[in-house]
């Protein structure tokens, strides 16, 4: 029987966090008990090291905090929590938020505009999220705001800016870039054929390599059945980097469900 880490060091003066309830979301159902235990251990440390800051009246309770921490730690389950160094706060709006965006065009003119954002991440600075999209990240649907922003953090460990190439060995970089750009081109071809709304992969992945890595990281964990057969070579690179195989988890979970169904009387 598994010994849950959050029960081992409870004291009479502490209120146990609702980890078992927090784990009961579709995205995490494929994890083994050992993986769940390891994930909770990381998430506990995450909550000790990072500050979750609710904004604009958003109410942050213990269950929400636990689920946010679990999603942050899923991508680094095998990499280690030190991969999430470089920020200390997570700012959480109740819904998508408006920011002032400044950008420079091809001839050097600077433009300012207000845009709606779901999340933001910088190399050194807080991660900004919104609860509506965090809730939508609980399902195994291919969308996951937290994993998207974590992927940007992992990406910037390789240099000053997000490039779509995480911190991997130098001999792997050329192959990674080749497969990533091939995926971007494939996604763009589908968009041109059927349109952004009908594309099977989020069109944002075709915008630049950094966004492609972040979007495909979402699919890696929450819709591996879409990612793996379409980009098998890149899939293997993601498996090697994250040291996880969500497709194998999905197959195991489906086999378990099928076995349970056949043994119901």
Curated annotation (Swiss-Prot):
Under Enzyme Commission nomenclature, its number is 3.4.11.-
Q: Which UniProt keywords apply?
A: Aminopeptidase, Cytoplasm, Hydrolase, Metal-binding, Metalloprotease, Protease, Zinc
Instruction: Tell me which InterPro entries the record gives.
Output: MetalloPept_cat_dom_sf, MtfA_enterob, MtfA_fam, MtfA_N
Any one biological process term the GO annotation gives:
proteolysis
The record's comment on cofactor binding reads:
Binds 1 zinc ion per subunit.
Tell whether Aminoacyl-tRNA synthetase is among the UniProt keywords: no
**For binding Zn(2+), which residues are annotated in this chain's numbering?**
111, 148, 152, 211
Q: Which SUPFAM superfamilies match?
A: Metalloproteases ('zincins'), catalytic domain
**What Pfam families does the database record attribute to this sequence?**
Peptidase_M90 (PF06167)
Homology family: Belongs to the MtfA family.
Q: How does it assemble?
A: Interacts with Mlc.
Q: What does this protein do?
A: Involved in the modulation of the activity of the glucose-phosphotransferase system (glucose-PTS). Interacts with the transcriptional repressor Mlc, preventing its interaction with DNA and leading to the modulation of expression of genes regulated by Mlc, including ptsG, which encodes the PTS system glucose-specific EIICB component.
Q: What's this protein's name?
A: Mlc titration factor A
């Amino acid at each position: 029987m598994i010994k849950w880490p959050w029960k081992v060091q409870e004291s009479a003066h502490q209120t146990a966090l609702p980890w078992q309830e927090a784990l009961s979301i579709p995205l995490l159902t494929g994890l083994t008990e050992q993986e769940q235990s390891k994930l909770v251990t990381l998430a506990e440390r995450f909550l000790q090291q990072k500050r979750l800051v609710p904004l604009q009246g958003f109410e942050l309770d213990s269950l929400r905090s636990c689920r946010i921490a679990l999603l942050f730690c899923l991508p680094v389950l095998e990499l280690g929590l030190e991969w999430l160094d470089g920020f200390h706060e997570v700012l959480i709006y109740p819904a998508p938020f408006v920011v002032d965006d400044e950008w420079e065009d091809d001839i050097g003119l600077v433009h300012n505009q207000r845009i709606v954002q779901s999340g933001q991440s910088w190399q050194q600075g807080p991660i900004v999220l919104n609860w509506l999209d965090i809730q939508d990240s609980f399902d195994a649907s291919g969308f996951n705001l937290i994993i998207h922003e974590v992927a940007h953090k992992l990406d910037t460990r390789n240099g000053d800016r997000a490039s779509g190439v995480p911190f991997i060995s130098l001999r792997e970089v050329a192959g990674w870039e080749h497969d990533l750009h091939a995926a971007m081109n494939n996604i763009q071809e589908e968009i041109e054929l059927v349109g952004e709304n009908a594309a099977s992969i989020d069109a944002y992945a075709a915008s630049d390599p950094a966004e492609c890595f972040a979007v495909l990281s979402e699919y890696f964990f929450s819709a591996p059945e879409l990612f793996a057969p379409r980009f098998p070579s890149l899939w293997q690179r993601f498996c090697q980097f994250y040291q996880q195989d969500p497709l194998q988890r999905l197959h195991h979970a489906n086999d378990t469900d099928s076995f349970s169904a056949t043994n119901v009387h």
